[in-house]
């Protein structure tokens, strides 16, 4: 069996990849470089020249070859490799007639606990959003603590240390009061806090027992993240920006997080994500896969989640729950009580509809940063 072609499928804000073999069996993957999918597309076109004529079963070899063939790597290149890796696993599972998780060591669970996101930004509205998720059966909500990323301007109140910490703490307090104790929170900070703010906020919300604090500060300096982690009792989750296993390993050895967030569409695919899970298991670190993308990303995450012992919870995009992107699939994923059923179909368990690019026209994402009240730029 040989690879005969690699084609690109743009749809909505996503870029999917289809790898075709001479048997007629094909696999699908997804690019994680959202906002820069045009650049990733050029990488994929170059990798097509390498892949055509190759055996699709040599997944580790192809991953290593593409990774080591470039002097300069980074997010765009690794997103392209990720899409290819996922598609190759999809092919292998389909040819052998088994789900990918069977090729990764077998199933460790039948369903995957997930959390939905609350896209409201006042204490009252956030509490209402949590109640709605609980009504749907979810047992965990992602709270967008530091505000709406689509807003480009912050207010003067965000310059006041005590006011900012109190505002964010009030959000968590309102949500806890609304839903009671039998519900978890994930506190998404989007890298927007300073270390001092992160420590003060973490200590202020300790009594509400959030599951974890996600990316409280910019993750570029692991030593500083570790310092923040040492000064609060709430676990930190980070790692979504990592593009190789070495970056993930550093987070764990520096004790910067108790949960790591591999992105199968940015790290290099399922292949390195499985390695990260093994590293994390040895360090008693939980896996919370990053997944803000499309349905192929979700399906690939489920295969990883189903095959590892240290899975914690799965990010599940709320826009899928609202019905829009479920229509991208021939057979939608099943969600019940906040748990996603792991598909038992061969490969990654899903197929995109044939006319996906027509029903979901491609969109471009512009350059968007947030501006502080004084005119300076803040992290997004």
Residue spans for each PLM region:
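Structured beta-strand/loop patches that form or line metal/cofactor-binding pockets in enzymes
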Residues: 1-28, 32, 319-326, 367, ...
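N-terminal amphipathic alpha-helix/helix-capping segment at the start of soluble metabolic enzymes
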Residues: 1-10, 16, 93-94, 98-110, ...
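Conserved, mostly hydrophobic/aromatic
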Residues: 3, 24, 47, 84, ...
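Metal- or metallocofactor-binding catalytic centers and their adjacent structured scaffolds
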Residues: 20-96
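Shared catalytic-loop signature of beta/alpha-barrel
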Residues: 42-49, 61, 203, 209-212, ...
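Proline-centered loop/turn at the N-terminus of a beta-strand
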Residues: 99, 113, 184, 235, ...
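Metal-dependent enolase-superfamily TIM-barrel catalytic cores that perform enediolate-based chemistry
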Residues: 111-231
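Extended hydrophobic packing segments that form well-structured cores
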Residues: 348-380
């Amino acid at each position: 069996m040989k690879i005969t072609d690699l084609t690109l499928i743009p749809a909505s804000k996503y870029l999917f990849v289809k790898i075709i073999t001479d048997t007629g069996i094909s696999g699908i993957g997804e690019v994680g470089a959202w906002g820069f999918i045009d650049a990733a597309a050029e990488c994929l076109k170059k990798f097509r020249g390498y892949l055509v004529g190759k055996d699709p079963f040599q997944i580790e070899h192809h991953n290593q070859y593409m990774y080591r063939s470039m002097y300069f790597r980074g997010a765009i290149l690794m997103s392209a490799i990720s899409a290819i890796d996922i598609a190759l696993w999809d092919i292998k599972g389909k040819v052998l007639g088994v789900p990918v998780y069977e090729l990764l060591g077998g199933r460790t669970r039948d369903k995957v606990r997930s959390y939905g996101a609350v896209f409201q930004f006042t204490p009252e509205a956030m509490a209402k959003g949590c109640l709605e998720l609980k009504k749907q059966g979810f047992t965990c909500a992602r709270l967008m603590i530091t505000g709406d990323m689509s807003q480009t301007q912050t207010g003067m109140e965000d310059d006041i240390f005590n006011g900012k910490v109190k505002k964010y703490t009030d959000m968590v307090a309102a949500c806890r009061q609304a839903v009671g104790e039998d519900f978890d929170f994930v506190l998404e900070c989007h890298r927007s806090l300073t270390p001092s703010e992160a420590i003060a906020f973490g200590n202020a919300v300790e009594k509400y027992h959030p599951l974890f604090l996600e990316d409280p500060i910019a993750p570029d300096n692991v030593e500083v993240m570790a310092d923040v982690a040492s000064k609060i009792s709430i676990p930190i989750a980070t790692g979504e920006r990592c593009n190789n296993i070495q970056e993930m390993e550093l987070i764990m050895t520096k004790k910067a997080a108790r949960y790591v967030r591999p992105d199968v569409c940015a790290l290099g695919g399922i292949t390195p994500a499985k390695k990260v899970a093994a590293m994390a298991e040895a360090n008693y670190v939980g896996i919370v896969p990053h997944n803000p993308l499309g349905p192929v990303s979700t399906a690939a995450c489920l295969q990883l989640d189903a095959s590892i012992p240290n899975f914690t919870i799965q990010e599940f995009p709320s826009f899928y729950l609202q019905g829009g992107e479920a229509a991208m699939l021939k057979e939608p994923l099943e969600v019940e009580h906040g748990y996603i059923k792991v598909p038992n179909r061969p490969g990654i368990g899903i197929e995109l509809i044939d006319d996906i690019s027509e029903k979901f026209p491609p969109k471009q994402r512009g350059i968007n940063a947030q501006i502080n009240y004084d005119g300076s730029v803040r992290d997004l």
